[in-house]
Each structure stands twice: as C-alpha cells, then as structure tokens.
C-alpha cells in the first residue's frame, strides 16, 4: 500500500512540476474575451513579415507544433492583409485558394521567397505564376480565385483576426482563449525555444 501511495504521489508531483513550467503572462496570455468556435490551434502570418519567414523556414515552428499536438487537434493557418497594401490582400486571397485546393505545403516556401528573398512577386499575376510552377493548372487556379468558397475563406480569415483583436504577426492562438507569448520563452538557444514553443501549444491545447 505504501509503495502504491508513493507512486501516486510521484505522479502528482510530476504533474504539478509540469504545469508549473507554464505561467499565464509568461509563455502565454489569456484573452480578455474568449472567441467561441475558434480553430483549435490558429496561426496568423504574412508573407511580408520577416519574423514569419523565420518562423516558417528557419525555426520550422508550424512543423514542430504539429508533431506535438494531441491526436485529433488540428492546426489552422490564416494570412493577414494588414501588411503589403493591395498585394497583401491578394496574398490573403491566394492563401484562401491554397486552402481550398489543399496545396498550402506546395506554395508556402515559393511565396515567402518570392516576396522577401528574390522579390519577384509584385502583382497578382506573379502570385498566379507561383501556383502554376507548383503544379496547379491555370484554369483551376482562376476558377478557385473567383469562387464563393475562396471569398468565404477570405472573409473567415479577416473575421478571425478581428475576433482576437490581432495586432501583429506571427501570432498563435489556442482554443480561442490563449495567445502564445514568445517573449516569455527561452530565446538563448534556438532548439530550446522551438521545443518550448511547441510544448506550450500542446499544454494549452490540453488545458481545461
């Protein structure tokens, strides 16, 4: 009996220590107004945002977060249109096309690089070329671009940003209640930071 009790006590201590690693106001903040019906894990980004490029291409935050998510928990990525003027809005619509066609993974890197690295994306036509080079037929892209589904996805992205009162990117929210706070994490080591970021998302996704 004593051994069982000690084992249970050890589990409780382990859980308490794990929970104590995460503090509201440190690794995350609780939203003043929770958003009902928000995606379970929601990341906002812009192809114009240098930090978003770093999160995606250097730190691989999205990939690492997905690996840590509990079974059945889905991650959603939305593009914002408050950067880049009219081209930023075109990129939000293009991201809606990518979501509708299920080709996000094919176009993410070339869109980031075309905007920030090679600066070859300067118009809606240039964006279209990226999709075609990624293997999407021009007719398919054009049909999606003008579709009701894509227009709805654009509105959905804009509404989601307004609902959480988004002020900047990259930003990640969990269950419409919590926002990740990278400034409160260990930035002395890249691998440690990425691990802590992904672990915090996992913790919040399981938080009741």
Curated annotation (Swiss-Prot):
Domain of life: Bacteria
Molecular function as annotated in GO: protein disulfide isomerase activity; protein-disulfide reductase activity
Any one of the GO CC terms: outer membrane-bounded periplasmic space
Subcellular localization: Periplasm
Subcellular location, principal: periplasm
Pfam hit, one: DSBA
Keyword Disulfide bond set for record: yes
Gene3D superfamilies: Glutaredoxin (3.40.30.10)
Phenotype upon loss of function: Induction of the PhoP/PhoQ two-component regulatory system, suppressed by 50 uM CuSO(4).
BP-aspect Gene Ontology terms: cellular response to antibiotic
Keywords from the UniProt entry: Disulfide bond, Periplasm, Redox-active center, Signal
Domain Thioredoxin: 20-150
Annotated signal peptide: 1-19
Keyword Disulfide bond: yes
Disulfide cysteine pairs (residue numbers): 49-52
Family: Belongs to the thioredoxin family. DsbA subfamily.
Role noted for this protein: Required for disulfide bond formation in some periplasmic proteins such as PhoA or OmpA. Acts by transferring its disulfide bond to other proteins and is reduced in the process. DsbA is reoxidized by DsbB. Required for pilus biogenesis. PhoP-regulated transcription is redox-sensitive, being activated when the periplasm becomes more reducing (deletion of dsbA/dsbB, treatment with dithiothreitol). MgrB acts between DsbA/DsbB and PhoP/PhoQ in this pathway.
NCBIfam families, per the entry: PRK10954.1
Name of this chain's protein: Thiol:disulfide interchange protein DsbA
Organism: Escherichia coli (strain K12)
Lineage of origin: Bacteria, Pseudomonadati, Pseudomonadota, Gammaproteobacteria, Enterobacterales
Name of the coding gene: dsbA
């Amino acid at each position: 009996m004593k051994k069982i009790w000690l084992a249970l006590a050890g589990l409780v201590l382990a859980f308490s220590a794990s929970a104590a690693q995460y503090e509201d106001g440190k690794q995350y903040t609780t939203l003043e107004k929770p958003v009902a019906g928000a995606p379970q894990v929601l990341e906002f980004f812009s192809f114009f945002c240098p930090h978003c490029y770093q999160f995606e291409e250097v730190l691989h935050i999205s990939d690492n977060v997905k690996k840590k998510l509990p079974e059945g928990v889905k991650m959603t990525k939305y593009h914002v249109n408050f950067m880049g003027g009219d081209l930023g809005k075109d990129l939000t619509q293009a991201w809606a096309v990518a979501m509708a066609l299920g080709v996000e993974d094919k176009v993410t890197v070339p869109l980031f690089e075309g905007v920030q690295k090679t600066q070859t994306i300067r118009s809606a036509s240039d964006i279209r070329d990226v999709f075609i080079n990624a293997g999407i037929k021009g007719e398919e892209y054009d049909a999606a671009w003008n579709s009701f589904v894509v227009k709805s996805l654009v509105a959905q992205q804009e509404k989601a940003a307004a609902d959480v009162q988004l002020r900047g990117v990259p930003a990640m929210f969990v269950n419409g209640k919590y926002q990740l706070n990278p400034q409160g994490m260990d930035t002395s080591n890249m691998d440690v930071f990425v691990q802590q970021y992904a672990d915090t998302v996992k913790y919040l996704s399981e938080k009741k």
